[in-house]
Structures are given as C-alpha cells and as structure tokens.
Amino acid sequence: MSFEIPRRQYADLYGPTTGDKIRLADTELFLEIEKDLTVYGEEVVFGGGKVIRDGMGQNGQATRDEDIPDTVITNAVILDHSGIYKADVALRDGHIFRIGKAGNPQITDGVDIVIGASTEIIAGERKILTAGGIDTHIHFISPDQVATALTSGVTTMIGGGTGPAEGTKATTVTPGKWHIHRMLQAAEAFPMNIGLFGKGHASAVEPLAEQIRAGAIGLKVHEDWGSTTSSIDMSLTVADEYDVQVAIHTDTLNECGFVEDTIRAINGRVIHTFHTEGAGGGHAPDIIKIAGMPNVLPASTNPTLPYTRNTIEEHLDMLMVCHHLNPDIPEDVAFADSRIRAETIAAEDVLQDMGIFSITSSDSQAMGRVGEVITRTWQVADKMKKQRGILAADGGMDLGADGSASAHGSAGSDNFRLKRYVAKYTINPALAQGIADTVGSVEEGKFADLVLWDPAFFGVKPELVLKGGQIAYALMGDANASIPTPQPRTMRPMFGAFGKAVQQTSITFLSKAAIDAGVPEELGLEKLIRPVSGIRNLTKADLKYNDATPDIQVDPETYQVTVDGEDVTCEPADVLPMAQRYFLF
C-alpha cells in the first residue's frame, strides 16, 4: 500500500525531490532536481527516533571490510556538471565511494550503500552538495590565503610564488628548484591541494625542464618577465615533452609582437590563458579574440567579474600596485590605462554566459580576491540571466555539453546555466591542469573534496568543507556553548585541518617526471602525491558546457567586441546579489 504526502512536508522531512526547485541564495537562479536516487518511503535520516539505528537503517553485522563506507551524506541535492539530482553519497578511504541509495539491505530493497557500525552520518537534507572549487590562478603571496580560500569552498590552489617578493606579487611563478622545493615543503602544513608553476622564461630547454623535474606541474609565461615568442615556444616545447600545462599572461604593450604573433608562437598547441579579457594583462586591445581558438583554454580572473559601476575605477589603482608601476611616470600610467577597457570588460560577462570563456579563477592578492571565485562566478550567472534572459537550453531538451541530448529541467529552472557555471570552477580547471581524474566533480572514485551549502547561503558561506572525506572547515558556533549553533557562528578549522590528518586528506600535485625522480622522498613529503596527466592532448572541446569557439574580433579604435559578427556587450550592474546583506556580521 502506498501513501501520499504533501511536497512541502516531504521537503521538510527529507529534503526536496524530483521536480522541486530551489532558489540559490538571493539570486534569480533556480535549480530543479532532475532525478532522485533515494527511494520514497525508505529514506534514511539520522537522529532520535529516526531511521539510521542498529537493525533498522544500519546493518548491525557487516564489518568495514565488507564495503561499509566511512561517511554517508544523506539526501543531498548534488549540483555538478554531471547532473543536478538528489542522492545519498558514501565516502570511503577519502574518496567518493558510491552515489545512490543508502540503508540496510536486510530490511530495505534497492540499497546501493550499506550503512554499518563504521559509518558516520552527515545530514544532507535541504542542503546542496558541490565539488570543492579549483583555483588555477594563485599568487602564493600570503599563507593566510589558504584559510580564506577554504572557507569560500575552494579546495585546490594552483599557481606560483615564494611569498611577498616583487616577482610573486606580480606573477604566478615559483622560479627554480630551490624555491619549488621550499614551497612544496611549506605546502605540507595546509589542508589544501596545491600545485606549482615554474618560470616559463628561457631561450633554451634545460632551464625550463629542470623546474618540471623539480616538481612544477606547469610553466607560467608572464609579460613582467617578458612574454616573448621565444619564451612561449620554449615553454610549450618542454610542456609537450613532460605532459604539463603552460599558463600565459601575454604582452600588453605589444613590444614582442601582437596577438597574431603570440598565436603563431603557440602554433596550435594547448595553452591555458589567464584573464583572457585583458584587464589583468595581455595584448591590448584584442587578446580577447584568442578565446575563440580550439587549442586555447580561456579563463577569467574575478576582479572584472561581474562588470559593475565600480569595476573601472578600482582597477587602475590595483594595477599600479600589483605590477610595480610608478604613478609619477607617464609611461607607467599609460600602460595601466591601456589594460582597462570598459568595452572588453563589458563583453567578458557575456562571453562567460555563452560558454566561450571556460574557467573562473582569482588572481589572488594580485588584482584578484582569493575568497570570491565561487561568489563572483554565481554573481555573473545571475547578472546574465537578468540582462540576457533564460538560456535557450533551459526549460526542455537540448544538446548537452558532450553533444548528446539531455534534459535540463522544466520551464522556470536554470539547470543548463547552472551546469555551465559550476563547471567553470570545478571540472574545467581540473581538466586544464590534468587533475580531473582525481578532483573536480561529484562522481564515484573522485577524491572526496566536497562542499555542503545551505541554499540560502549558497555560493557565499559554506556549511561544511570536506577535504579527502574529513571535515576540514565548518560553520561553527561558540565553543563554550551547550550546543554547536549559538552565535557567533563563523567558519572555523575542524579536525581535518590539524596534525597528520592534513597529510592524509590533502594532495600535492607533481609532474610525473618529479615523481619518477624521487622528489617526494628527497623532500620527505608526507601529503598524498598525485601526478598531472593528459594535458597535451586536450582541446577546448573537452571542457564541459564551455566549449564554444566562435570568431571573436575587437575594433582597434572603439574596442567594441563582436562574436561571429554580432556586437557583444552588457551594462554594468548597480546592485549585486550575494553581497552586503551576507556580510553585515
């Protein structure tokens, strides 16, 4: 015999289900649950008088060796490039073990995940679960960035630097074996996955190759070191040999050539372009056109995202500080002015919304904010919905990111747009850096870097941040209170952020060459070590929901951007969601 229950009551008890919609924070973005892998009437819930008790929802006989998970997140709504759906999520040995229906198969049919005596429970009812964010544009200037990033939902930081040296304040470079090794040793202290870029500036192969063998997972070419065609070619030659990435900040002043010369130097090889719009640096005024190429993996940094009435004014001062410029030197001021163009900045939001720009990142403390990658990504999505309307792919059947037919919810939902935007800071940067087999999505077998959100605070303040299956940061109240919730509730480090747990729940990414050379053993690294791989065969077509390659042009006099001949622009925002009302206290 079956029973019916009102949807509102069901959502209060077990969380929303198929067809229900959830508003994300205070935006106009609405998520619709596409499917529910739990079983109606057999939902598992923890608590007094609830289901997960010995002999009921928990199997009292199975040992951990019988595939019992370490943790189950119950009834969570998963928001991922792979789908938007509800499920129980099992974690084991620091990885996502299974996604499906949890419970006790001795009394319940359809159980994929057996809850046992070894299992901890995290209540995912009425919560949204995403993969941890991946920021591929980190200037390692201050160690405090790590906690700031973690508390925003970012669990992987890739970039370069040595601390507050002038080279690091301007460029994401950890130059040479000695600095690379010291930074790898420093990374042992942090509950964060970390990978380093070496300096991609040499006129011979060996000065670059030795940095890859020392542990760098890529090379950074930056105009402040000279973004010459020779440096570009040499870096890509080494990258092809060692299967690592090259990230590039091109030549704003066009001293070493124009954008066409850079394109010729790249010569069809895959490359990860930073702040591709150009305000963060790059050929003035038309570096943005490179985003339409099939071998280019284009990213934005967050200071220009989204375009607001304050964007232009704040950028000039930021640029002068970050790139060691002197406001008393006219040429330095002209250099700064050439990078800040309202027309190309206005086009950037639209190119993100069209899936032409594929990745968002921070440019931490070097014209970007390390704790705002996720927030600003969703602010762009909201701004674009308000200015451009609902995407054609939303509200019915359309082609998915892989070219196959897939449903993206009913009218009134934004599922396609949500998949496009969540991919920008999860799976796509993972693909670009060769770590997508380890992190970047909520899929079985992936490392359990996960973020749990209250929908009202989605994209702004996480509820829990899990690193390698253990809670590393959480929204926590007064430690002297009688319960966990009294004010002040702030994001605080949890047990996963301390002691030797850090080494078992966080990853240092290295090149295969460094691993083969015994760098982890030489340096005494205790963190989990994973290689980067599969980079040199990438194309933009591999990026999820953000693989468009149109013809992009920039008028050299007006800076107006066109995509396939159509003008592309948007108005600056006066008001944004996910902003001051969330940070009053």
Swiss-Prot record:
Q: Which residues form the active site?
A: 323 (proton donor)
* Positions of modified residues (N6-carboxylysine): 220
Instruction: Name the Gene Ontology biological process terms.
Output: urea catabolic process
Q: Which PROSITE patterns match?
A: UREASE_1 (PS01120), UREASE_2 (PS00145), UREASE_3 (PS51368)
Quaternary structure and partners? Heterotrimer of UreA (gamma), UreB (beta) and UreC (alpha) subunits. Three heterotrimers associate to form the active enzyme.
HAMAP family from the UniProt entry: Urease_alpha
Annotated protein name in UniProt: Urease subunit alpha
